Amino acid sequence: MNCAIDHLVITAPSLAAGTKMLHDALGIWPQPGGEHVRMGTHNALLRLGEKLYLEVIAIDPAMANPNRPRWFRLDELTAQSMPRLATWVARCADIHAAHAACGAMHGEIEAMSRGDLNWQISIAEDGSMPFDGIAPSLIQWQSPQHPASRLEDRGCELVSWSGLHPQAERLGDLLYALKIESRVSILSPPRANLVA
């Protein structure tokens, strides 16, 4: 069981706020993604590699409330919240084996879709993120084509990234259990933070 970084997740109070923040930082607008009907969210995407992308995600005000906590703690955001790099998602060849290696903190494995894309993803019942977002959610794509391959290459790539968490040793053990193929620096500050 090997896992690799699949995508980084920026959460925002609105898709417009999130895409503007990304444009202000990089000078590039992400491409429209689509809607996640089961979660009442929508996204925009920026390719970072052949099987790697950056996702900006927000609640879609035009969609019905899902009557459950939304993923990535989106329900906790207010209109005044700043868009931020909240977490990342690890791609697994066998999500059930990866989930078993992680334990209960990753929630349940659920089937999701967006347009013609289908996948399984780990989602905590309360919408929280493992290790405050520094540990990944888990994903296994059911579609033959990775979504990053559909995106325009705008010359962006992930150069480095670091996870900062007070329980760095425990987090490192989790990433080791997942056999994460990409290098991530894990540091131990007083507060959790993700930097890319």
What are these regions (language model features)?
Residues 1-5, 10-29, 48-196:
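Glyoxalase I/VOC metalloenzyme domain signal
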Residues 32, 39-51:
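N-terminal low-complexity or amphipathic/hydrophobic leaders
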Residues 37-42, 189-191:
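Beta-rich nucleic-acid/ligand-interaction surfaces
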Residues 34-37, 61:
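Short, acidic/turn-prone active-site loops that include or flank metal/cofactor-
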